[in-house]
């Protein structure tokens, strides 16, 4: 009898272990501090919630690389996938197959088309982030007829193109004399980004500002201005404080923005855990995230989408941050 009970206990233990939820957290690519920080937040939340979180991504930002990872995670039996998409539609076939197999699919940082996921963990609406970019630049640019360049990762990435579209609309409305002289891309490559930034500065010797809403492009733009001794150019955009700290301390960058990407990773895993344990989240529902607070599910329309469906929506981060010399040492990510 004791032997049977022991065997039963072992069997139940194995079944319990097999039933533990596994969540895949996928960046656009590995080796970039921004994404690593998001992954750290995701893994930290996994430990708090008792779920297994795996952080992995392609070495280059490509649809094929992300699709391969998605398919691998599905085949390995992962229960949820959270991905920062390199393309709004390129991942959709793989993600829809995953959902058909019962896998919960969420996006973070950069969205797919909304029908290809359930919830998007969004750092801010395009209007919020596009407006922030222009506001940071306008506080430094004094010339009414300023010349401005946009510089970010690629012409196809969802999030950054939405922000830039809104930023350009705000410039047209509020700073009609500004001239957007060029829009160029670094393709998430540090070397190419530096070369591109230097090329912009050389091509436009009277440039007043570079707006770089990308974790590789912003430090590259700052480094390029130092290399070419172009002190009069305002450099603004989005990146992590640990990457930008030296440029802020040297005065090359006066202000840049971001959101707490560690917090974003935590929120994403908490939302995925809710979907796995408690079921779908609909617009108007809330998720209580330990240490952050209660976050509401918003309609897809806050991102400019027309698609709405049951179990589908957007969770916005509670705030965005502008980093300056005065506050940057309060942050470590």
From Swiss-Prot:
It is found in: Periplasm. The complex is composed of two ATP-binding proteins (LsrA), two transmembrane proteins (LsrC and LsrD) and a solute-binding protein (LsrB). It comes from the Bacteria. Part of the ABC transporter complex LsrABCD involved in autoinducer 2 (AI-2) import. Binds AI-2 and delivers it to the LsrC and LsrD permeases. One of its GO terms (cellular component) is ATP-binding cassette (ABC) transporter complex. Keywords: Periplasm, Signal. PANTHER family: ABC TRANSPORTER PERIPLASMIC-BINDING PROTEIN YPHF, D-XYLOSE-BINDING PERIPLASMIC PROTEIN. The lineage of its organism: Bacteria, Pseudomonadati, Pseudomonadota, Gammaproteobacteria, Enterobacterales. The gene is lsrB. InterPro entries: Bact_Solute-Bind_Prot2 (IPR050555), LsrB (IPR030159), Peripla_BP_I (IPR028082), SBP_2_dom (IPR025997). Its main location: periplasm. Residues 1-19 form the signal peptide. This is Autoinducer 2-binding protein LsrB. The keyword Magnesium does not apply. One of its GO terms (molecular function) is carbohydrate binding. CDD domains: PBP1_LsrB_Quorum_Sensing. Belongs to the bacterial solute-binding protein 2 family.
């Amino acid at each position: 009898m004791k032997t049977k009970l022991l065997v039963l206990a072992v069997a139940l233990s194995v079944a319990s272990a097999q039933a533990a939820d596994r969540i895949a957290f996928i960046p656009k690519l590995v080796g970039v501090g921004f994404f690593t920080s998001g992954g750290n937040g995701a893994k930290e939340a996994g430990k708090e919630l008792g779920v297994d979180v795996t952080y992995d991504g392609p070495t280059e930002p490509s649809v094929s690389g992300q699709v391969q990872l998605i398919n691998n995670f599905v085949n390995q039996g992962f229960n949820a996938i959270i991905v920062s998409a390199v393309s709004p539609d390129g991942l959709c076939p793989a993600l829809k197959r995953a959902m058909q197999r019962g896998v919960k699919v969420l996006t973070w940082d950069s969205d797919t088309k909304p029908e290809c996921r359930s919830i998007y963990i969004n750092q801010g609406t395009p209007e919020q982030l596009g407006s922030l970019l222009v506001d940071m630049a306008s506080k430094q640019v004094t010339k009414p007829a300023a010349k401005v360049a946009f510089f970010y990762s690629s012409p196809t990435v969802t999030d950054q193109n939405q922000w830039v579209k809104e930023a350009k609309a705000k410039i047209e409305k509020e700073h009609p004399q500004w001239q957007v002289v060029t829009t160029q891309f670094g393709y998430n490559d540090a070397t190419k980004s530096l070369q591109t930034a230097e090329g912009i500065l050389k091509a436009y010797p009277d440039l007043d500002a570079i707006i770089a809403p990308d974790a590789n492009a912003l430090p590259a733009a700052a480094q390029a201005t130092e290399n070419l001794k172009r002190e009069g150019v305002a450099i603004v955009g989005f990146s992590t404080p640990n990457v930008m700290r030296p440029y802020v301390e040297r005065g090359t960058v006066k202000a840049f923005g971001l959101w707490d990407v560690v917090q974003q990773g935590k929120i994403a895993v908490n939302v995925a855990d809710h979907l796995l344990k408690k079921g779908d989240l609909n617009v108007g529902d809330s998720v209580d995230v330990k240490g952050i607070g209660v976050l509401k599910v918003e309609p897809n329309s806050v991102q400019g989408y027309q698609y709405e469906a049951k179990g589908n929506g957007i969770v916005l981060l509670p705030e965005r941050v502008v980093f300056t010399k005065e506050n940057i040492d309060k942050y470590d990510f």
